[in-house]
Design a protein with these regions (language model features):
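Residue-level signal for inorganic ion chemistry
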Residues: 55, 79, 90, 123, ...
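A cross-taxon signal for low-complexity, glycine/charged-rich
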Residues: 1, 7-10
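Short loop segments at secondary-structure junctions
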Residues: 140-144, 154, 163-166, 172-173, ...
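Acidic active-site catalytic centers that drive phospho-/nucleotidyl reactions
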Residues: 73, 79, 83, 102, ...
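N-terminal subdomain of lithium-sensitive/metallo-dependent phosphomonoesterases centered on the IMPase/IPPase/PAP
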Residues: 25-120, 283, 287, 293, ...
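DPxDG-like acidic metal-binding loop motif
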Residues: 109-168
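An extended, acidic
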Residues: 180-301
Length: 301
């Protein structure tokens, strides 16, 4: 693995956190727990930056070998090397934490913390030189997603969040800013993001996305994590995927939650195991879920 720079990092003032109406012992416990989380979030930001630098060494290069996995999804050396880098760094820094990733076997957790990693979400975009692919790192604590990082290496852009600390957005060398989902209340004014038609047809759900498209103002096929990041940063109201693995959605759940929105499965449940996913604003959630919940179920769900 090549040496890489530490990258962007945000340091939170954990010592100044206050928890009203709590005993001193409980405040200390909560402060300790929050410190553990924010240490991990800061490290996740570093890891996403390091992985992104590695990925860009392969981006838009001649002769990039693209293989097909068992499910026919593409994978490259950049996918594998980036996840391996993340796993190796995690083993050194947080050896008791578990890791669930797309490219390698699971590592069980010994302390309740688990990292859920997709080194390149949007490998097809990456392979074809489209900059909308991202590195996703989610942090789970006792089965709850508590922090997430979504970094777009080719655009030098990152969206991240941790429980109780808001959702933040940073582009290149600009100052980071806190971000929120749009306040749109009328679905006819909404902007919809969706993924490639192949998945909609293969799951028998093409008519479902058409039903949502008929309701909104604008529909664009900017899929994968980029579409969901658009919702978190106030540039879209709805992003829908008919197929999502745990590593596709894990980082997005806390990001959307802290941005004031929702990232759930099509039944409206906040879970990494639903098999599908939607990011949506609070005002439009019930309308969108009402449509999605009528879709044909995924096999085994």
């Amino acid at each position: 693995m090549p040496d890489v720079d530490p990258g962007f990092r945000r340091d939170y003032p954990v010592d100044n956190l206050q928890f009203p109406n709590s005993t001193s012992r409980f405040q200390k416990l909560r402060r300790t727990a929050m410190s553990q989380l924010l240490d991990r979030l800061n490290f996740a930001l570093e890891l996403a930056s390091r992985a992104g630098q590695l990925i860009l060494q392969h981006y838009r290069t001649d002769g990039l070998l693209v293989e097909s996995k068992a499910d026919q999804s593409p994978v490259t050396i950049a996918d594998r090397d980036a996840e391996l880098l993340i796993r190796q760094q995690l083993q050194q820094r947080f050896p008791a934490d578990g890791v669930l990733g797309e490219e390698f076997p699971d590592t069980p957790s010994e302390n309740g913390f688990r990292w859920i990693v997709d080194p390149i979400d949007g490998t097809k975009a990456f392979v074809h030189g489209v900059p909308l692919f991202g590195t996703l790192i989610g942090i789970e604590h006792h089965d709850r997603m508590v922090a997430g990082v979504c970094r777009f290496p080719a655009m030098d852009e990152v969206v991240y969040a941790a429980d109780g600390h808001g959702c933040w957005w940073k582009i290149r060398d600009q100052a980071e800013r806190r971000t929120h989902v749009p306040q749109t209340t009328d679905i006819s004014h909404a902007r919809l993001m969706f993924t490639e038609p192949t998945h909609w047809r293969s799951t028998g759900r093409f008519e479902t996305i058409v039903s949502v498209m008929d309701q909104v103002r604008i529909a664009r096929g900017w899929g994968d994590c980029y579409g969901h990041a658009l919702v978190a940063t106030g540039r879209a109201e709805i992003a829908i995927d008919p197929l999502m693995s745990p590593w596709d959605i894990a980082a997005l759940i806390p990001i959307l939650r802290e941005a004031g929105g929702h990232c759930t499965d099509w039944k409206g449940h906040e879970t990494i195991f639903g098999g599908d996913g939607v990011s949506v604003t609070p005002a439009l959630k019930d309308q969108v879920i009402a449509i999605l919940s009528k879709a044909p179920p995924l096999p085994g769900k």
